[in-house]
Structures are given as structure tokens and as C-alpha cells.
Amino acid sequence: MLKLLLGDPNTRKLKRYQPMVEEINLLEEDVSILTDDELRNETHNLKSNISSELNIKKQKELLEETLPKAFAIVREASKRVLEMRHFDVQLIGGMVLHEGQIAEMKTGEGKTLVATLPCYLNALTGKGVHVVTVNDYLARRDAEWMGQVHRFLGLSVGLIQQDMSPAERKKNYACDITYATNSELGFDYLRDNMATEIEEVVQRKFNYCVIDEVDSILIDEARTPLIISGQIERPQEKYQKAAELSLSLIKAKELSKDGIDPEGDYEVDEKQRSCILTDQGFAKCEEALKVNDLYDPKDPWAHYITNALKAKELFVKDVNYIIKKDEAVIVDEFTGRVMPGRRWSDGQHQAIEAKEGLKIQPETQTLASITYQNFFLLYPGLAGMTGTAKTEEVEFEKTYKLESTVVPTNQIRKRQDWADQVFKTELGKWKAVANETAEIHRNGRPVLVGTTSVEKSELLSSLLFEQQIPHNLLNAKPENVEREAEIVAQAGRSGAVTIATNMAGRGTDIILGGNSDYMARLKLKETLMPLLVKPDNEHKPPIPQQRNSKSGGGFSANVDSIANKNTKSGVDSLFPCQLGEDIKRKLSLLSNELVKNWGDRSLTILELDDKIATAAEKAPTEDKLIQSLRESLSEVKNEYEKVLIHEEENVRNAGGLHVIGTERHESRRVDNQLRGRAGRQGDLGSTRFFLSLEDNLLRIFGGDRVANLMNAFRVDEDMPIESGMLTRSLESAQKKVETYYYDIRKQVFEYDEVMNNQRKAVYNERLRVLKGNDLKKQVIGYGERTMEEIVEAYINPDLPPEEWDIDQLISKVKEFIYLLNDLKSEDVSVLSIEELKNYLQEQLRIAYDLKEAQIEKFRPGLMREAERFFILQQIDNLWREHLQSMDSLRESVGLRGYGQKDPLIEYKNEGYDMFLEMMTNMRRNVIYSMFMFQPKSEKVTNN
């Protein structure tokens, strides 16, 4: 009703941007007549003007005034460098981002290009801009591709990659615009706050940040905090013993009800992802291990057994992790990508290693941690882009104070979303998926099938193999990941079939008919790699054959209209045609030239990729070899385009890309992302989801209603079921899961919010020390506070002075400051409480000056070094212990809910007390250490 009365708020918002769009369009002609150098000068002048304004409010006003001109300049630079002109809707997207909102833009609407607008504008402040992507590949791609626009305009562009040294990181963070992944940014922030010298700090103060695929980073990854950890030794045989014991324990068929244990040794709660021993299970374990109590603090076992059971029941090989080089590597449940270097905490990873018979790595202890929620809230300016924000609008608003605005598409969407097909069994579903894939493939349309795990993608692959359908497999297995660019490049070709886990296509558009640009790059890589890249057994050949049918038919087996002599019947390799002799000869000459200059097999694969990527750019280059590489790349691309243009026409006529979803994801948003791969930029396309009543979502969250439905439907397994009640069950299950995970994220956020205030206080204190402006004043401040605390601890103001315990007080002061050994009770017995505090603080300052004089005799400046060392040492050690204590507190307050107490309030109150105690201990330890510090004489001694 409100919508009818007031109109759609989104439409009202968009109307507000229209006058600004018109102003930018009016400026287009004026800007287009400027030379390249004049455009760069404009940038230089704008930057000088804006960065010199120190008042933040006035600087913001200047940015608003500059916006139309800045956007017009970026649009012009993009036309010249990328041959891409920002549409009006993309200008609106840029304004939405500049205002610190989330821009929802559909797949293929050019989100990456939109980001150049607010990034350029905010970089004019000179304070730096971060563009955040979900993986290293996308960060590198965007820095190379969109970075051309910024470099052309005279701004510096940085890139942060996983294997960079601190010096390289510092240099890249100092650039005007820096591209990085969310995890690299977060870990650098934590490492900076563990630095022992100011020179080790790599990041600048945060300013403005644009997050690409914002939902993936701020929502999907928000349940998992970033943790830097150090190793601690734990007995490895306990993991092995627990793994063996878990195999003999029997799982209960149902969960306990009303406190009554079911039959069996343990119960599994898939929803909570937990395993709980029954009384029978406890007894069995205690007997097998010959112990009286699994929770005995001197010899604890419960934790090991629970982890072993979770490894057995809830962590599935090829779904949650894969084995690579004798290591268990985590697979990201949202993207389907492997996450090397990441490990599950609390001994869970060790339990999985024991289960798989792998070498057990040492367990770790948290040294520093932060959640993505609190990390990104450190940015004064935060914005994001995604294809699907509206489903999570409330969470963005509540947690991050980010509004969402839907930016209209440039062209009308022509995609058709076909009705879901639901099957009684999983097997029936997979057969139907294989049949529909085969049918659409035979019609000459490309098909993308999204699966939820490595295991499922391989099951479908075997079914298609039986039907003799050639296809490509893209999942977390290393041999497939290395072919990602190649597989996506040909996923839009006529009759192409691509099976992909959730990683499907984030950041890479599937172009109908095939991507000639990618294919040309890969052709050059295939040609140059054997000659230029160091031999390395790690790397598979870059272009392995696709999984073909026994008949040898290829993608285009039934499409006979590609009129080109060079086209093979059925694309049995990646490339659409054989290159002409002329181009082959040129490539051969180029190869010899490159070997002569770059060395015989002396580059890494990454270096070769970078050189080919640079050649693919349009930015001017002085490097003659890159120019030659660029010419060859262009010729190969043109040759391929001649063939692919026909193929594109055929694919369009056949109906475009068809996307098949094989399971509803826990979040409707991920389903929408998969659908969004089809019908980009007004293309034709279609989508369909195939589901079964045995799918995880329905099984775990569907409740009894779905179980009853299963019994009610007496239909064959390969007969699709259509039922309104079923569709409603499905939607309610998805909403239930979304709410469930939102509550978990909210809880993670609320608990980390308590830690966040403490973290800020500790990190600010550390930064003060690293900058070292006035360390002496800081330490004396600690001492004065300690003297106050000693007086308050030993003097009761309610008692008469003659009853005060002055002797104990003096004794305590001497414990901290041995230089005050001459201090006597009678010196202070006549003083009031305030006078006593002032007197002791005065004595402390005198003693500290005396100590400084002693230390400085050894070496000038040694006292300041000692102050920095002891403060940092105490902060780091006590903070580490505090993190452990807060973890334990969080676990224990959960039980207080049973006593009608709010666990979060208990956590806040006790956490605050523990934090105050930690800071008190830190001050006291520093004072004690400073007075006890005795440098070793630097005389040379003979041993």
C-alpha cells in the first residue's frame, strides 16, 4: 500500500541521479576534444586541488562538485584505452558507489567498468582507494584491465598478490588505487598490528573501498573470522587413537528428544554441524581408552573424540576438502575453489588428517583475529557491487549501514526461467539432468551445469560419458582449476557442455559463440610455454584434451553451418580453427625473438601470463617485444573471430546459453547468481533447476512435511513431481536456512563487536608505541597509574589513617621499583590518600630519571629501545592470552542461557572486566621490567 502511495523508493532514488547523468553527457563533447596529455593534466590539477584540502567535510563537498567532470574524464579515457563507453546506467552505478551504497547490477552489465568511476574520483584525495575482489586471479585481471584507464590518466595502480614480500606490499598500498583480495587486506591489517618496527607496517590509513561481489565477501564469508596463529604442540597419537575409536562407535538413527538419549553411541545434528556422545558412547570411550573421565583437565579426551566424529560424519572428502600432495586442502563451500594454506581450527583439521592417514600438522593458537564485518567497518567510505543484493538488503543495512540500490539494466532481459523439476530420488534427478543436457547440446546450444560439490560434478560427468556427450569439467581438483580460463573461454560455443561447481563464472562472462580474446591468449601461451617457461613437474600442460565421447564427436557435431574450411568437424581442441601458414610463420619468428631476449625456458608461468596480459592491453608501451606480441595476439584473435562470428549467430538462433542448477543452494542469492550466467546484456538464454526430495536442503531443513511428501508420492524415480505444496516447502526451507545463517552471522558480529572495541584500544596503543613519539611519557603514565592502583588496593578510605596498612603498601611499591629501597613507612604515614598518591608518583618519576641515567651510560638511545621492546612484548603476550580467555569465556557463557541469563550480556560484562585486568597487568609488567632491566656489559669476554 505504501509503495502505491509513495512510489517505489528505488525509482525515486534513481530519479535523483538523472540531472547529474545529463550534466556528464553535456560535458562529453568538451572532454572528447582534449588530447591525451590534456586529460592527464586535468587529473593532475583536480588531484592537487582536492588533496590539498585538509578539512574532511570541505574535501567531501569538493568531491561532490568534481563528480560530473571526473566521471566525464573517466568515460573518455575508457573510450580511448578500452574502446568501452560507460552507459548512462553505469554512470548511475558509479554515483551509487560514490555515495557509499551497494549497487545491484545484473550479470554482464559491466560492474567492473562501473568501479573505475568512484575509484578515480576518490583517488583524487591522495588517500588511496582499495578495490576488493574474491580471488587473486580477479584482482590481477582487474588491475591489468581496468588499471589501464587509471594509468592512462596518470594515477598509480597497485596490486596485492599472495606471494608478495612486505616491501612490494608497502609499495603497492602506497598507490592511488590498489586491487587486492579480501583475505590479503585483512591479513595485512592483522600483520601490521603485530609489527615490531614502524617500517614493517605496509598499509596506510583506510580511506575508501569498493567491494566487487560484495555479498560473497560481507555475507558468505562473514561466519569465518580471519585468524593469524602460531603453532602449539599437542600429542599427535591422541588424534590417531580418536580416529580409530570413532570407527567403532555407532551413530544413533535419530536425535534425542526430551533429554532421553536415542540408541547408539553418538548423535549427529547436521543443522548445527555437531556430534554429541550419548551416555552409552561416553561409557564405551572411557572403557576403550582406560580413563575415568573424558573431560579430565590433566588428560582430556572429549575434544579429540568429538572432532574425530565430526571428521567421520560431517567433513566429506571431495565435498568439504580434497587430498592434494598428501595434504587435506579445504574447498570453499560457496565458490567451490580450493583454499590452500587455510586450516580448520580447534584441532578439526588434525582430526581430518588422522581420518585420511595423512601426516598430522601441529595445532595452532590464535595470535590475532578479526571478522570481515568489523574489518570492513574500519573504512570511512565503503561501497559494493553485486548481481544479487536485494535478498540480503536487511543484513547489509543492519550490520554495515549500507543501503542497496538496484541499477536498471542497459537492455531488456530476454532470459526464460523454466519451471523447477523435482524428483523423488537423487538418481532420478541426475538422469533427468543428463537427458536435458544431451537434448540441448544436440540442438547446438551451449549448456552450463552448476553442481554443489566435486563428487556430484564427477557423477554427472560419468553419466554424460555414457551418453557420449563431450564436456568440460570445472571443479576444485587441481588439474581442472588450471584450465579455468580455457574452459570458460569456450563455454559459450555451439553445443559446448560445461559442468562447474559453485565457482561457475564469478567474474568471467560466458560469451556466446566463444571468447576469441581468451582463445588468442591461450594459443600464444600454448605456443610460447614450451620455449619460455621453466620445466616444472607441478604444472600440467596448459591445453589438455576435453573429456570427449567415445565416438569422438565434438561440440559442433550436429551444427553443420560453420562455413570455414579450417573448422574441424567437432571442436576436438580449444581453438575454433587451424591458423594460416602466414600466422604460424610469424609466431615461429616471434618465439625465436622472445627466447633470444627473455632467455630459454627462464620464465615462470605467472611471468608469461603477465607478459601476455600486458600485450592484450591497449595502453601505450615502449617495449618492442610487447608490441610484437600484441600484433601477433591481434592477428590470431582476428583469425578466430572470423569463425566464431558464425558460431555466435548459430548459438543466438538456437536460443543462447542454457543454465541447469542441480540443487537449491542454502541461499536464494547463489541460485540467482547461477541463473544470471544466462541472458547477459539482453542475450537470449534459459535456466532450469532440477531437484530431488533427497537433496540436503530439503532433508535437513525441510522437516517432517517433506518426509511425509516422500511417502505420499508413489511415483517412479524418473518422473518429475510438480506440486504447489512442494514449491512452498522448498521456499520456506531456503528462507529458514537464510534466517538460520543470518542469526549465526549476527551472533558472530555481536560477540566480535565486544572484542572489536578491545582490539581497537590495543592496536591504537601499539601504534602509539611503534610511532614512538613520547615513549618515556607513556611508561611514566603506566607507573603513575600503577602507584594509584597500589594505594587504592591497600588503603581503605572508610578506616581511620592509624588503621591503614602502610607497611604492606611500601613493601608492594618496592616490589615494582627496587630503586625506592630507602622508602620508609614513617615518610608517608602522615599523608592523606591524595597526598600519598602524589608523593609516590613523584618518587616514581625521580627513580625513573635515575634509571634512565644508568641505562644511557651503556649506549645513548638504549632506554627508548627498551621501552618500545617491553611495551610491545607485554601487549602481544597478554593480548594472545586474552584472546584464548575470551574464547573460553564465549564457550562457557553459552551454558548460562539455561540459568535465564543473557549469554551476550554476561560475555560483555566479564569480557570488559578481563580486558581491564589485562591492561592493568600490562602496565605493571612494563614498569617492573623497565626497573629490572640491566643491559649486559658490552666488554668482549673469552669463553
Curated annotation (Swiss-Prot):
Keyword field: ATP-binding, Cell inner membrane, Cell membrane, Cytoplasm, Membrane, Nucleotide-binding, Protein transport, Thylakoid, Translocase, Translocation, Transport
Any single biological process term in GO: protein import
Membrane topology: Peripheral membrane protein
Coarse class of the protein's main subcellular location: membrane
Region Disordered, annotated ranges: 534-561
GO terms, molecular function: ATP binding; protein-exporting ATPase activity
Gene3D superfamilies named in the record: Helical scaffold and wing domains of SecA, P-loop containing nucleotide triphosphate hydrolases, SecA, preprotein cross-linking domain
Residues annotated to bind ATP: Q90, G108, E109, G110, K111, T112, D509
The EC number(s) this enzyme carries: 7.4.2.8
GO cellular component terms, semicolon-separated: cell envelope Sec protein transport complex; cytosol; plasma membrane-derived thylakoid membrane
Catalysis: reaction(s): ATP + H2O + cellular proteinSide 1 = ADP + phosphate + cellular proteinSide 2
Group of enzyme by EC: translocase
Coiled-coil spans in chain: none
Highest rank taxon of the organism: Bacteria
Compartmental location: Cell inner membrane; Cellular thylakoid membrane; Cytoplasm
Matching Pfam families: P-loop_SecA, SecA_DEAD, SecA_PP_bind, SecA_SW
CDD domains hit by this protein: DEXDc_SecA, SF2_C_secA
Summary of subunit composition and partner proteins: Monomer and homodimer. Part of the essential Sec protein translocation apparatus which comprises SecA, SecYEG and auxiliary proteins SecDF. Other proteins may also be involved.
Family: Belongs to the SecA family.
HAMAP family linked to this entry: SecA (MF_01382)
Biological role stated in the UniProt entry: Part of the Sec protein translocase complex. Interacts with the SecYEG preprotein conducting channel. Has a central role in coupling the hydrolysis of ATP to the transfer of proteins into and across the cell membrane, serving as an ATP-driven molecular motor driving the stepwise translocation of polypeptide chains across the membrane. Probably participates in protein translocation into and across both the cytoplasmic and thylakoid membranes in cyanobacterial cells.
Protein name as it appears in the record: Protein translocase subunit SecA
Originating species: Prochlorococcus marinus subsp. pastoris (strain CCMP1986 / NIES-2087 / MED4)
Gene: secA
